[in-house]
């Protein structure tokens, strides 16, 4: 299997790192040099990875094509590229919907939208795909947990929640900075906060049948967790989180 990546940002990097360390059998990975630094890092990391400057040559050389560019760049260059029916085309582009992708690609190839996140480099996390595709599902199951979505409108909800990655990291950063200001060394602060949230995430994953129950069980009457969650609710933290999600969803729905 020969794979081609149009766009070499952080997501492409994470996906490729996951592929290299997985059981996926591939003979070659061709990457563009849109991000010269990342492209060079990847090509040096594995002999099977080669940089090709011409996007069309990448497409001509592979069976699977991954579109990992911004929406603005995607709308500009995809329609100029020539695809074939044999191609399996996987788009990581958030706001270019299937109808527009088909219009740009022109041929009746297998086209799938996917939502990979950075932990895919560790072969962890969910990878929502639309529409369901057996080959693509098998591929991504080597890199995490594939979630098949039958309705594109429903898939927008998954794109929305994936936008909470940066806010999550901002929470980790804010809490680690708070510890640092209280006199804790940076390394210790970051290690504690990240380890704490990893443990909480694993615990919630193993008990995910009822997240609301977890919220209740993690509090004791007049305890510290009860105080924190009550104060954050009063401040509108969770209400604003919902508002932000709705705002992101509206943006995705407006995209053509």
Residue ranges of model-derived segments:
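A general structural signal for well-ordered alpha-helical segments in protein cores
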Residues: 12, 39, 62, 74, ...
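Internal alpha-helical scaffold of NAD(P)-dependent oxidoreductase catalytic cores
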Residues: 100-110, 125-159, 163-207, 247-255
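Small-residue helix-packing motif on alpha-helices
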Residues: 29, 39, 58, 74, ...
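Solvent-exposed alpha-helices and their adjacent loops that cap or buttress functional pockets
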Residues: 4, 23, 82-83, 104-105, ...
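A structural micro-motif
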Residues: 1, 27, 49-50, 87-88, ...
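Rossmann-like NAD(P)(H) cofactor-binding subdomain of soluble oxidoreductases
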Residues: 15, 38, 45, 54-129
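NAD(P)-dependent Rossmann-like dehydrogenase/reductase catalytic/cofactor-binding core
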Residues: 194, 198-256
